[in-house]
């Protein structure tokens, strides 16, 4: 148990260099590829940060190009815009620096409206 918690803490520290924002990822299975500089989180994955939270089947953190890729059926996500909580879902999610991309059967719920599309790009706030 201690080893698993220590490993997850270490992974969090390594992965947190990807973004200027702090975040936490939890998963049933974690795989580290030190040659490709990838961390894979598999099964019941949850991602939480100040800006965005989501649940997915799989998340890959690529430290080479500062990118997070997630997939699910669907991914359930929550984010804030000007203090307003917005819910959504998509089959694919990507975070590159401070930009969130949602792809494949995207649905956004905002102010009682439902927006359906195949792709959405959202600029997240930069941290001070």
Where are these predicted regions, by residue range?
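Bacterial N-terminal signal peptides that target proteins for export
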Residues: 1-7
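N-terminal signal peptide c-region/cleavage motif recognized by signal peptidases
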Residues: 15-16
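N-terminal amphipathic/hydrophobic interface segments
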Residues: 20-128
């Amino acid at each position: 148990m201690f080893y698993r918690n220590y490993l997850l803490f270490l992974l969090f520290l390594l992965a947190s260099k990807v973004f200027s924002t702090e975040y936490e990822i939890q998963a049933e299975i974690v795989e580290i590829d030190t040659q490709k500089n990838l961390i894979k989180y598999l099964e019941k994955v949850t991602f939480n940060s100040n800006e965005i939270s989501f649940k997915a089947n799989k998340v890959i953190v690529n430290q080479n190009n500062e990118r997070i890729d997630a997939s699910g059926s669907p991914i359930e996500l929550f984010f804030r815009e000007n203090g307003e909580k917005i819910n959504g879902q998509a089959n694919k999610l990507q975070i590159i620096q401070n930009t969130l991309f949602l792809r494949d059967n995207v649905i956004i719920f905002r102010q009682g409206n439902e927006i359906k599309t195949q792709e959405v790009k959202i600029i997240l706030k930069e941290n001070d």
